[in-house]
Amino acid sequence: MAKLRQAAFLSAILSLPLTSAGQAADLIGFWDTQQKGGNSFNELTPDKAYFEALAGTGATWVRLTFSKWKGEGRDFLLGNADNYQGLPQEDVAKLRKALDAAHSAGLKVVIVPLSLPGARWSQQNDGTFDDRLWSDPAYADQAVRFWSDVAAEFKDHPAIAAYNIVNEPAPEKTTGLAENGAMSDLVAWQEEQVDGPRDLVLFYNRVIAAIRKEDTATPVMVDAGYYANPRSLAAWPDRLNDERVLYAFHMYEPYEATSSGNMKREEPYRYPGVTTQYGGEALSWRKADVVAHIDKAFDWAEEQGLAPTRVVAGEFGCMRRWQDCGTYLKDVIDAVDARGGHWAFYAFREEWEGMDYELPLSLKPGRFYWMMEEGKSGDIPRDGKLMELLKEELNG
């Protein structure tokens, strides 16, 4: 917020409570210029040293999920995704401590659950996709109450830069719709879901309305449908009702090449050049295709009258040992930077080594996990060339 010096009455604005309109403008103001950061998807609660290390890369924000942490109940902060009954206070204290640590390191935080009532994260659900939230309205009601409680509890915390309602929602998944099918199919599917339990736009508007009753200031980040696919965002008929919303997509396409499964092939797919089914036809991926995929989100935002600084590449990445990972990361960043959006790489010092770009190519996965199990995490080499590439982009 600009310093006010001209008249005595203006100074009173600075004393307005956090949830005032004046402070709301200030909070969204963080996102008025491009911000670059990283994801924290750790099983152990990150401490100050972790956040300081992330800040040391040049990151200004962290997308922090808490759902993998050990909580009072089965599901951290939810208690139980089968029946939400309120925020467990031990979990609240643990999350607040992590937020304090991030704040002391100078990072802004976007908090994001992997699970919501009726939508337990598949990796904590025996590998099964939990579709209840998208088929039973009772769970949507619970999700609304959950976020109302979170907003009431954390609205005054200085570290929080946005509430990210849920990671990678996929109300489309069980309906037979192809994830990267024809754009006309995505649009038609969205039209068919209007006012139903799978209407993600309706769901988000409901949740945000509940948040605003408790917290008028904090921005909200929303992942697009079908695992935060920019094409699913482009199928939305309208922007959301609230003005302090950031629209997020994730970028791993072509997934067949960037994901762990590719590393198990005798000859891993290469980029550029890998061919996948996309938009109803075969596509040989090159930089222009990466750009076109990402541009779907920015073009939609422009059509909706939104600034490019309201669009976020909330995750992107590739397997660190894939020989084309550096080329891919650079192409993704170039595409987002060209449009002026925000980004956060996946991920920083996760317990999984697959996308830990600090690790050098010479460090084999087995060696990494052995060192972690032996309590030698401090001795793990962290001079990977991919992180040097990211640092250049973070500080550029």
Across the structure, where does each feature detected by a protein language model lie?
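Bacterial N-terminal signal peptides
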Residues: 8-17
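N-terminal carbohydrate-binding accessory modules
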Residues: 23-85, 300-301
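An active-site-proximal structural segment forming one wall of the substrate-binding cleft
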Residues: 43, 50-59, 82-113, 124-165, ...
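Surface-exposed, active-site-proximal loop segments in enzymatic domains
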Residues: 70-90, 119-137, 173-189, 356-364
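Active-site region of glycoside hydrolase catalytic domains
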Residues: 123, 131-283, 295-319, 338-344
